[in-house]
Amino acid sequence: MTFQTNKYQVIKNAVSYDLANFILNYFLLKRDAVGFMYKHNIHSQSSILGTWTDQQIPNTYSCYGDFVMETLMVKMLPVMKQHTGLDLIPTYSYARAYKKGDELKRHKDRPSCEISTTLNLGGDPWPIFIDGTGSNNVIDEYKNIHKPNAPAGTKVLLE
């Protein structure tokens, strides 16, 4: 299975367990700290700190452009280039800390997601759906993938 023929690819062990666990714990700690600061008026709401108001999954913490996630995106760039054969330019990162009962509904990503990466850093397994042909294809239910998504573009899935 190659990216060039299937328009998606699952890449096993793209991120080490230790790195994934470190980033997961960082993001969960950030979520809790930001929640505390907002609740106790220690810091005003700021997109750089994250939000619970994303319309795709309200009341679930997410952050656009988190510095650690941006760093991970740059670190994964050589892997993405190697597997796609494309000269890619990183555009943005977006992270979400799913909680029990959350479901990311079928949606279309913005044009800058033409080539994108879906990565689960920990938690329960969820299937990922990719609709590059007009049908629902369950790609993998491996323990390190959990973001169900059906974007308009193509994906490389890092595990």
Predicted regions located by residue number:
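A short, polar/charged loop/turn motif at coil->beta-strand junctions and beta-hairpin connectors
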Residues: 4-5, 89, 155
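A residue-level signal for beta-strand positions that form part of recognition/binding surfaces
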Residues: 7-8, 92, 127
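A short coil-to-beta-strand element that immediately follows conserved catalytic motifs
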Residues: 85-94
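Conserved active-site beta-strand element of glycosyltransferases/polysaccharide synthases
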Residues: 97
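Catalytic core of non-heme Fe(II) oxygenases with the double-stranded beta-helix
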Residues: 100-159
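Non-heme Fe(II)/2-oxoglutarate
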Residues: 1-84
